[in-house]
Structure formats: C-alpha cells, structure tokens
A protein has these predicted regions:
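Active-site neighborhood of HAD-like aspartate-dependent phosphohydrolases
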Residues: 1-28, 40, 47
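Conserved donor sugar-nucleotide recognition element shared by glycan-biosynthetic enzymes
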Residues: 5, 34, 68, 122, ...
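Conserved H-loop
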Residues: 19, 105-110, 136
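Short, acidic loop-to-helix structural element flanking the phosphoryl-transfer center
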Residues: 60-87, 93-97, 123
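A short, structured active-site edge motif that brings together acidic residues
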Residues: 106-120
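Conserved Lys-Pro-Asp/Glu-containing loop-to-beta segment of HAD-superfamily phosphomonoesterases
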Residues: 122-150
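Acidic, Mg2+-coordinating phosphoryl-transfer loop and its flanking beta/alpha structural elements
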Residues: 141-180
Length: 192
C-alpha cells in the first residue's frame, strides 16, 4: 500500500498549500497514527484537516493504488490452511477491509482490526483482536514490516516475525529483537 500512502500524503500537503516532505520523511509516516505523523510537520490546528484530506484521498484513490508483493497470495493460502489470520493495522477498519477486498485477499482473514480514537496505536489494535478472539498473547504472532509492528508486539507480549521487504528498515526492525526474520514470503512458512 506504500504507493497509495505516499500519494495520499503528498496530496494532503498540496491541498493544505504547504511543501510536502521528502520521500524518506513520508516513508517514516507509514506505520504510526496519522495524527502523530502530521504533528511532526504541521501546526496543531491543521492536523484534523490533514487527517480528513488524507483519509478522503486514500478511500477514493489510495486503496486502488495498493499492490501485493510477489508470493503473498500463495503465502496467505498456505497460512490460512493451518492458522486463523487477523489483520491489525493503524489504518481505520473500513479502509483496511476495503483494501483487502480490492486486492482479492479478504477471504483469507478471520478478522480485520484497525485504529480508532479509542484504539489509536498498534498495541491497542492488537489487544482488541486478542480480546475479541479470546487469545492469550502466547497464542499469537505478529508478522510485521515496521518498527511499530515490533513495538506493538512487545507491548502486548506476542512473538514477532519481522519481514525485511515492505515499509520498514531492516536495521530498525532488528533493534526490537524479533523472534524470527523473513527475507522472502517462503521464509515465513519455513519458520512457523
């Protein structure tokens, strides 16, 4: 979803009439709550408007710009045979649901959990999924590509499988001492 996210951020800054941060800075916005990202470069009074512009663009265009990494459909097919799969994301739930439907992967997941004002951080969303499905932390593993995934896992006591493709920086991921590391989708199947 990085293309759609990047485009949504640049569109938002353009609509607000302010210079867009560089691509590296925008890449760093992928993972934390939108409000936190916008707070690093906009005045407080513009944050709510920025979030609204971003979400409107992302809902209309951004989710259609998302693409799956190679081998992900095959990975989801295999994992869903043996494990219940859930998405925990800092996107809001309807957007995440729309995106999975658009990508043709919605049917692989037993639940999709996104952020809300009550659950703004990754750990909050993970806790919501664990509680809803009555899972103990030791029964869950996060497969994540950002430090925010690793932090959310640490804060909730679940195991961490870091993937080195995607948004995150491999060096950043390693600082959170993941239980497993996957450099390609097939590595996940070998490690679980």
């Amino acid at each position: 979803s990085s293309i759609g996210i990047h485009n949504a951020f640049t569109h938002t800054f353009k609509e607000l009439g302010v210079p867009s941060p560089d691509a590296k800075t925008i890449r760093g916005f992928m993972g934390p709550p939108l409000e936190s990202s916008f707070a690093t470069c906009l005045p407080k009074e513009q944050i709510a408007e920025a979030v609204q512009i971003y979400r409107s663009y992302y809902k209309e265009k951004g989710i259609h710009e998302a693409q799956l990494f190679p081998q992900i459909v095959e990975l989801l097919q295999e994992l869903s045979k043996n494990y219940p799969l859930y998405i925990t994301t800092t996107k809001n739930t309807p957007t995440a649901q729309d995106m999975t439907k658009n990508l043709g992967i919605h049917h692989f997941f037993d639940g999709i959990y996104g952020s809300s004002p009550e659950t703004p951080h990754k750990a909050d969303v993970i806790r919501q999924a664990l509680q809803t499905h009555q899972l103990a932390p030791e029964q869950a593993i996060i497969i994540g590509d950002t430090k925010f995934d690793m932090i959310g896992a640490q804060e909730t006591g679940i195991k961490k499988l870091a993937v080195t493709w995607g948004f995150g920086d491999e060096k950043d991921l390693m600082t959170y001492q993941p239980d497993w590391v996957a450099h390609q989708p097939a590595d996940i199947l070998r490690q679980l």
